[in-house]
């Protein structure tokens, strides 16, 4: 083998080992996100711990960043950590506005509304909650459908709009 051939083999081995590391870290991140999603409703503190253990530099694709963003916002809310920072949910909003399932869109807009609500922007929160409601009409979304209607009713009640509040409260 010539010197050029040896160098070429060396470079090829380096590229293969680096791509293997990237692939493994991507697989590990996907596994962590799935684990966090599985325990979100039963053990939200564990979900938050899992998400906080993820190295965000390993979120190399838009879909991974969006999923992490949504799950992290959910975990904060489920642990009664009232985030007002739109930067946390923005990657999910940007991604799921045009892609994703109705379930992902529903959750994204619900949690966008929650962050807006926490920040005191009730008008934007209502718009986001109503948008979330538009994606909640599949049979497997009954819990979220009730949660969305309840939250909309609460926001209208806070604004002393009791008529609208009652109309959404009746949907629960």
Regions found by a protein language model. Name each.
Residues 1-9:
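Bacterial N-terminal signal peptides that target proteins for export
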Residues 3, 13-14, 139:
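Exposed boundary/loop context
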Residues 9-19:
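Bacterial N-terminal signal peptides
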Residues 21-172:
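A "functional boundary" signal
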